[in-house]
From Swiss-Prot:
The lineage of its organism: Eukaryota, Metazoa, Chordata, Craniata, Vertebrata. The modification Phosphotyrosine is found at Y72, Y109, Y130, Y151, Y170. Phosphorylated on tyrosines upon TCR activation; which promotes recruitment of PTPN11, GRB2 and CSK. GO terms for biological process: adaptive immune response; regulation of T cell activation; signal transduction; T cell homeostasis. The modification Phosphothreonine is found at T126. The chain crosses the membrane at residues 24-44. This is Signaling threshold-regulating transmembrane adapter 1. InterPro entries: Sit1. Negatively regulates T-cell antigen receptor (TCR)-mediated signaling. Involved in positive selection of T-cells. The modification Phosphoserine is found at S62, S65, S84, S87, S89, S164. It is found in: Cell membrane. Residues 1-23 are extracellular.
Length: 178
């Protein structure tokens, strides 16, 4: 049997019948294609809506854009290269005390802790624990050289009974004059 005997001139290509010969097959193909496209459009719509909703819930703190939120604390405005819009307008009007307020806002502080989601009640966070300066009277055996005797101890619960320096402002400063 040769292939030419089975093939008619009404075929679009080998094995694909024309619309007049198999209109029901082409109609079914069209319906399935339309349902597939509608399903794809609905899926993309739900995906973008859900993504937009999660971005609104997890958005930047206090309504500011991500570029405005500093990553590290204690950045002076000369180091960052920009001022806030409020301090720029206040520096232009010195009669309202804008220069003093602009100088106060020159240093930025931020917390590197994650903020709670906007739907929850914010907690007070962990309280700040201050350092104590203590004198280490126990010598440590080390051959590399002498270590300094004064050091700052963070959360030094076990060393609190040792000597502290209440009359000095800082660990390495001179005693307060009497």
């Amino acid at each position: 049997m040769s292939r030419e005997n089975n093939c008619t001139t009404a075929d679009l290509a080998w094995g694909i019948p024309s619309i007049t010969q198999a209109w029901g097959l082409w109609a079914l193909f069209g319906v399935v294609t339309m349902l597939l496209l509608i399903s794809l459009a609905a899926l993309l719509s739900q995906w973008t809506r859900g993504r937009r909703r999660t971005q609104e819930e997890q958005g930047p703190p206090s309504g500011r854009s991500v570029e405005e939120v500093p990553l590290y604390g204690n950045l002076h405005y000369l180091q960052t290269g920009r001022l806030s819009e409020e301090s720029r307008s206040e520096e232009q009007d010195p009669s309202s005390g804008g220069l003093a307020r602009g100088a106060e806002e020159a240093t930025c502080y931020t917390s590197l802790q994650l903020r709670p989601a906007q739907g929850r009640i914010p907690s007070s966070g962990t309280p700040i624990k201050y350092c104590e300066v203590v004198l280490d009277s126990e010598p440590k055996p080390q051959a590399s050289g002498p270590e300094p005797e004064l050091y700052a101890s963070v959360c030094a619960q076990t060393r609190r009974a040792r000597a502290s320096f209440p009359d000095q402002a800082y660990a390495n400063s001179q005693p307060a004059p009497s």
